[in-house]
């Protein structure tokens, strides 16, 4: 198995291919990407044996922007016999994976492939039993062992492979299953909820998304992102010249400032800054840098709207510029970006300041005083 399969949003195969080619080369792994437009996945074929496994282990999945999932696969299995689809799949995995912890029978995220989902769910049960019988899978699921993947791209045609549980997406098809809240102001609320799932480890939610925290939402109207912050019992300053939905204002947790998000200056410190404004990505990232450099927030989640062409290059340049500005100002920060399932022509970025790395900075001293006061 010397191919890497990467799931992505249909229409972004070229961006996904450009990214994996760049990231692989940085690890001195070389190959070429096979791209089929609107297929929802990309194949990266490595020139050297075992290089796909090297990428699956050493290339941090969290650093990939356009990939929803990353796995090692073999040759395409074609024309699986309807009377026995299981034997060829088991044969390809025999001796490749031992003691896998989970089986996922998946499809690309396309309208055509979704017709196969019902089959995949039914097929999973007998296939899992057969793989356990030959010890490719453990008898019980184990979240710390490799995940076995079967990716059906058409009836009777699939790629078979595996991913490492500590370097993949934990979600089926790489997509978190979120339910739209009936009382949310807009569907954009799911973007921020998904961002929390992707960027913030579940065991850190109470600490980093806790009750009573202070947050600012730039470009808040009508309140989709503010809704998520309110649900986490935060106190929110909503910045927008437009109206907020009355239900959010009635909570008593939201203060609405009718102001331009690019001109607003907070009076105090904040734990969170979120921003989903429709503006050029360079302008938004510069605004985020200003907030972080001035110590106006600890963490930020924001969207960068993508141009029609050179989308990977545009995002890479904006992230590099942001990182450089923070570095020049003595800010030690973690930066991550991902095109989420609920994103469209955009990517979502998360920045977290690393506290204690820059002792004595003005903003750190102010936070320490506030913590002592509280």
Curated annotation (Swiss-Prot):
InterPro entries for this protein: RlmM_FDX, RlmM_THUMP-like, RNA_MeTrfase_FtsJ_dom, rRNA_MeTrfase_M, SAM-dependent_MTases_sf
GO molecular function, one term: S-adenosylmethionine-dependent methyltransferase activity
Binding site for S-adenosyl-L-methionine: 188, 221-224, 240, 260, 276
Keywords in alphabetical order: Cytoplasm, Methyltransferase, rRNA processing, S-adenosyl-L-methionine, Transferase
GO cellular component: cytoplasm
Role description: Catalyzes the 2'-O-methylation at nucleotide C2498 in 23S rRNA.
The family this protein is said to belong to: Belongs to the class I-like SAM-binding methyltransferase superfamily. RNA methyltransferase RlmE family. RlmM subfamily.
Record protein name field: Ribosomal RNA large subunit methyltransferase M
Species: Edwardsiella ictaluri (strain 93-146)
């Amino acid at each position: 198995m010397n191919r890497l399969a990467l799931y992505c949003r249909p229409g972004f195969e070229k961006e996904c291919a450009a990214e994996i080619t760049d990231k692989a080369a940085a690890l001195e792994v070389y190959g070429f990407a096979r791209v089929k437009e609107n297929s929802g996945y990309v194949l990266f074929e490595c020139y050297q044996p075992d290089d796909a496994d090297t990428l699956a282990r050493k290339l941090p999945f969290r650093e990939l922007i356009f990939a929803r999932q990353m796995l090692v696969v073999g040759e395409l299995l074609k024309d699986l016999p309807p009377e026995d689809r299981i034997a060829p799949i088991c044969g390809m995995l025999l001796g490749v994976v031992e003691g896998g912890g989970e089986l996922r029978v998946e499809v690309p995220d396309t309208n055509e492939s979704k017709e196969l989902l019902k089959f995949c769910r039914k097929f999973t049960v007998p296939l899992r039993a057969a793989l356990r019988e030959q010890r490719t899978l453990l008898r019980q699921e184990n979240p710390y062992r490799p995940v076995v993947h079967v990716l059906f791209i058409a009836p009777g045609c699939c790629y078979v492979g595996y991913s490492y549980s500590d370097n993949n997406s934990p979600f089926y098809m790489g997509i978190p299953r979120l339910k739209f809240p009936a009382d949310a102001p807009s569907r954009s609320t799911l973007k921020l909820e998904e961002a929390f799932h992707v960027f913030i480890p579940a065991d850190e939610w109470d600490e980093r998304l806790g009750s009573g925290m202070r947050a600012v939402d730039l470009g808040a109207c009508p309140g989709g992102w503010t809704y998520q912050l309110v649900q986490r019992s935060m106190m929110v300053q909503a910045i927008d010249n437009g109206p907020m939905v009355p239900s959010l204002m009635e909570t008593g947790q939201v203060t609405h400032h009718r102001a331009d998000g690019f001109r607003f200056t907070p009076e105090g410190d904040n734990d969170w800054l979120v921003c989903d404004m429709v503006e050029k990505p360079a302008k938004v990232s510069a605004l985020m840098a200003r907030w972080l450099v001035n110590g106006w927030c600890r963490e930020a989640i924001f969207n960068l709207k993508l141009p029609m062409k050179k989308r990977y290059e545009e995002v890479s340049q904006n992230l590099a510029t942001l990182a450089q500005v923070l570095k020049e100002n003595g800010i030690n920060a973690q930066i991550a970006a991902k095109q989420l399932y609920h994103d469209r022509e955009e990517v979502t970025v998360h920045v977290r300041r690393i506290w204690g790395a820059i002792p004595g900075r003005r903003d750190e001293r102010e936070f320490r005083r506030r913590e002592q006061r509280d």
